[in-house]
């Protein structure tokens, strides 16, 4: 069987800088709790990490939204916290509580991390990627992903989600050497993880820096831009031709510097980014992806239709991938997603 060329995959064409009408579309968390078939598979798996680490089921939930909506890209079903789990930290997902980790408290904890075990321990994830590469439609692109080092570090230091990131920030300010040592481990482990995903069949990579926006400018440069830039350059050098999308959520005006200094091929915009500014300032630098508010997808109706039109009118004249500003939320009606796809793909 011949491998489809990238020119047959609109998502990859857009990331290569082409302007397409209609633009390619996929949605963050397109495999998720809003789909009844996902909830059934999740129940079959038991725990959330069991679902991530069971290739047959992870392939199934990745394919479920493609069957309904024929998105232009599939994204590996996994979680950013499989990386800390693979390098030696306990990770659990508790109902109503989110992720719970055994927090790092010392330099000794950092030095005890085991990045050399990552590939072996994440073998099931790479098996999922291989399964998806052979199962997705020929015009659908396969996205691999990881959390950015800063965002993953916050979970490892805070022990889970945080309102103020006081522990992680205190490591930056009062224990800079220890924090830098942790980030070095995560930069190396993340690069290794993404290269292994590419080798298993991922055709593009997205790096999620969910908590990028909580850092002041100086720290944003040091702990968001520099690590993602290093990972992006390593991927470009070692696996040329595989595009990288950065998603520094909440970066504000620093989005421009982020694009220029990391060398990403595409950038995910959160819902707060002004569209006219993005079209004028960001789109000449790289492909932009986003950025409808996920709650408008819950609302549906005229408000959603107006938002889709605004996005297409403003960003549709350059390299653009339609997406949300963050992930689909569980209360989203599946029929609203179908309507969204129809709107994006309607002749203009």
UniProtKB/Swiss-Prot annotation:
Top EC class of this enzyme: lyase
Catalyzed reaction equations: uroporphyrinogen III + 4 H(+) = coproporphyrinogen III + 4 CO2
UniProt-annotated location(s): Cytoplasm
GO molecular function: uroporphyrinogen decarboxylase activity
Gene Ontology CC terms, in alphabetical order: cytosol
UniProt KW keywords: Cytoplasm, Decarboxylase, Lyase, Porphyrin biosynthesis
EC number of this enzyme: 4.1.1.37
Residues of the site described as Transition state stabilizer: 79
GO biological process: protoporphyrinogen IX biosynthetic process from glutamate
Source superkingdom: Bacteria
InterPro entries assigned to the protein according to its UniProt record, in alphabetical order: UROD/MetE-like_sf, Uroporphyrinogen_deCO2ase_HemE, Uroporphyrinogen_deCOase
Gene3D superfamilies, per database record: 3.20.20.210
Disulfide bonds: none
Binding-site list for substrate: 29-33, 79, 155, 210, 326
Assembly, per entry: Homodimer.
Known role: Catalyzes the decarboxylation of four acetate groups of uroporphyrinogen-III to yield coproporphyrinogen-III.
PANTHER family documented for this protein: METHYLTETRAHYDROFOLATE:HOMOCYSTEINE METHYLTRANSFERASE RELATED, UROPORPHYRINOGEN DECARBOXYLASE
Alphabetized NCBIfam families for the sequence: hemE
HAMAP family membership: URO_D
Family the UniProt entry places it in: Belongs to the uroporphyrinogen decarboxylase family.
Protein name listed in UniProt: Uroporphyrinogen decarboxylase
Organism whose genome encodes this protein: Rhodospirillum rubrum (strain ATCC 11170 / ATH 1.1.1 / DSM 467 / LMG 4362 / NCIMB 8255 / S1)
